[in-house]
Amino acid sequence: MPTKRQLCKHEDDGWADLNGLVESLGPEQMEEPGYYPDWSVKDLVAHLAAWMAEAARILTQVHYGTYLKRDLDVDAMNKDFYEANHDLPLPVVRAEAFAARNRMLAEMNAIDEVIPEAEDWFEESGPRHYQEHLPRLREWVQELQGRG
């Protein structure tokens, strides 16, 4: 099992790639639909933030020994996250993403022993999740910048 330092380094590398692409866009580009048909880059950032916040919540439970595994309806959660965040202003979405990431990292750091569930939540909500979305984000950023 990787150490916390290795897990956080993996997350930091993925975040740097993702955030670099996001920051290469102007505010109007971040809000233009097309990342997915109805999603903008802002919606993607909100989506990632929601899952990082969920991971932070779970990691807190792991830290205090109150974590109970439960089945998730990921599609329903994604829909709820989208509906809750879609109309938020871009600066709020970006601030929430940075806050959620910081909390996720802090909660991971607070855990005495990284158990498999903690590793899974951290990886799935952080670096693996970034990797899942990076290919399409790279394409969409190229398309947006090519219009300029």
Where are these regions (language model features)?
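Alpha-helical bundle segments that constitute or directly flank the non-heme di-iron/ferroxidase center
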Residues: M1-P27, A50-T60
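Acidic/histidine-rich alpha-helical segments that form the ligand environment
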Residues: M77-E117
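Short, contiguous alpha-helical
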Residues: D12, E31-A76, N109-G148
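Hydrophobic packing residues in well-ordered alpha-helices of helical domains and bundles
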Residues: K4-E11, L90-A97, E123-G126, Y130
